Amino acid sequence: MHSKSAVLNQSFIAKLAILCLPSLFLLTALGQRKHEPPVVEDFEHRAQQYLDTQKETHVDIKPSGSAAKIDQEKQEARQKIKQARPEAKQGDIFTPAIGNYFREQLAITLQGPDGAKIRASLRHAEPLPNLRLRVNSRYPSNLPLQSTPPTLLANLPYLPGELQYRIVGRTLVLYDVSSGLIADLLPNAISNQNKIKGK
């Protein structure tokens, strides 16, 4: 009898633990967010403000459409976002404080155990000609969209799927995936000390 009761108790405790796991994960995530530096919260807020503006354009880009149709929809989205952000400038999202934080995080990563591999990956990326990128402008369609090693971004704040980090030379670009716009950029994100040889 006692044995059966013990088994039932163990079964109940196991089920209770399973039910509590999602709550524990949620509490852990909330606890981690509480410990985020204010500068990260400021960045996330500014990035979300950009996405809110993007959503207000009400342009639905359908991936299943023809290439010409998708390009037309992207162009329409870019135009509406530009109209909604007529005064947009470098530093609206990457403020000086946020920019310094990002530079520090990138430097930490490049000086870490994966630094050599990251530098090699960037060194082998397709070279870009001297290029002047501007906020609220389209990333030039005739130039390759540089891929960024995931390990380089490990210490950077999380981004929603609509935005991506891109490294162009030594500049960090905040790239709007759906419209192809440059939401903001951070010059000299990679310091001279971490400059990629051959760049």
Q: Which residues fall in each region the model found?
A:
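Early exported N-terminus immediately downstream of N-terminal targeting peptides
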Residues: V40-I98
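A short, solvent-exposed beta-edge/loop patch
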Residues: L163-V177, L181-I182, I190
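Mid-length scaffold segments of soluble, non-membrane domains
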Residues: E76-S147
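C-terminal partner/receptor-binding element of secreted or periplasmic proteins
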Residues: L181-K199
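Boundary at the C-terminal end of the N-terminal hydrophobic targeting segment
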Residues: A29-G31
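N-terminal secretory signal peptides that target proteins for export/translocation
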Residues: M1-F12
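N-terminal post-signal-peptidase region of extra-cytosolic proteins
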Residues: S147-G161
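Bacterial N-terminal signal peptides
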Residues: K15-L26
